[in-house]
Structures are given as structure tokens and as C-alpha cells.
Amino acid sequence: MSRMLNQIPRLITRSFRTSSVGYKATLGPILENKSQIQDLVNKSEWNIVDIIKFSEDEVRNIKIDSRVITKMLRASGLKDSLSEDQKKSLIRGLKLQMIFIKYLYEGDEAEFHKIEESNDDVFRLILSDHKAPKPITLKSLLSSIENLENEVDAEKGEIKSSLDISKLNGNNPTYFTVRSNKE
């Protein structure tokens, strides 16, 4: 009898398993009614403080001083003759940006909830993803430079006329010199 059992072919089974991974995160305050949603959608600018919860201890733990700001301004070709209040404002802004970048890379791990583990890879094959971009010509490049001032995007935090090229450091020989018509 045992010989017979050994001779019975075993059934081969195949299975197909799919799984999904879900993440949950809270971004900003909870919206409770239609008017709050409409206000959020119609708001063209935003603030890091509105989105990310952080403590002042986190801000204090980031080591940035006026020397760092001065080096950054010099490396950028900008004038580094700022008042102490302006430097403090730039230091705080840079610290908030570093907190925001850390949040983007690491996420708020306390708010992410992994529903199910998965090692599935998701990809898409769409022709438009693989089309070569339109080549840049001198004419299109020059026209885009002329229209640069009109292409300010408030959603990206860009402010119209926020960079005055006449305030660039014209005495910096290692980078560039900008002369304005005001001189």
C-alpha cells in the first residue's frame, strides 16, 4: 500500500497573491465642512508652520548661526551686509526649511500607519512618459528669459519682483557682476 502512495503523482498548485499597502498621514488641520475645504483649495500660498507640527526645541537643536548665513550669501553672490534682525529672520527661515526637508524625506513616522506588508512593485508603461522632450532652441530660450518675470507661481512660494538684481553683489569677482541701469 505504501508503494502505491509513493507512485501517486502529487498535485502541483499555483497561486497568485496580491496585496496592497496603505499609508495614512495627517497633513494640516482636519477639515470639517464644505467652506473649510473651499478655503483650502482657493488659498494659493501656504506656510510650513500650517502643515508640519514641530516644537521650538527642534528649531533650537539645528545649529545655524550668522556665519553660515554670511557664507551662503557670499557663495550665492548676494550682499552679506545685513542687520542682525535680518540675519535672525534668515536663520529661522533656514531652520524651518531644514525641518520641512527632513519631514519630506522621513515623513512623520508617528502618523504613518502601514496596513499590510508587501514587496510588490508597481510601475506603468505609458508612451507619454518616454517621449523625448521638445528640443530647446535659442529663440525659445530667449523668449522664456523675457517672460520669466510673468511666470511667477505663488503656489511654489515665488513672489513677483522678489529678486532685485541690482542688489546682487557686484564686487564678487569669482561669480558674476551685475550692473543695473540705476548706476
From Swiss-Prot:
One of its GO terms (biological process) is mitochondrial translation. It catalyses: L-glutamyl-tRNA(Gln) + L-glutamine + ATP + H2O = L-glutaminyl-tRNA(Gln) + L-glutamate + ADP + phosphate + H(+). Belongs to the GatF family. GO terms for cellular component: glutamyl-tRNA(Gln) amidotransferase complex; mitochondrial inner membrane. Allows the formation of correctly charged Gln-tRNA(Gln) through the transamidation of misacylated Glu-tRNA(Gln) in the mitochondria. The reaction takes place in the presence of glutamine and ATP through an activated gamma-phospho-Glu-tRNA(Gln). Required for proper protein synthesis within the mitochondrion. GO terms for molecular function: ATP binding; glutaminyl-tRNA synthase (glutamine-hydrolyzing) activity. This is Glutamyl-tRNA(Gln) amidotransferase subunit F, mitochondrial. Keywords: ATP-binding, Ligase, Membrane, Mitochondrion, Mitochondrion inner membrane, Nucleotide-binding, Protein biosynthesis, Transit peptide. InterPro entries: GatF. It is a peripheral membrane protein. Its EC number is 6.3.5.-. Residues 1-23 form a transit peptide. Subunit of the heterotrimeric GatFAB amidotransferase (AdT) complex, composed of A, B and F subunits. It is found in: Mitochondrion inner membrane.
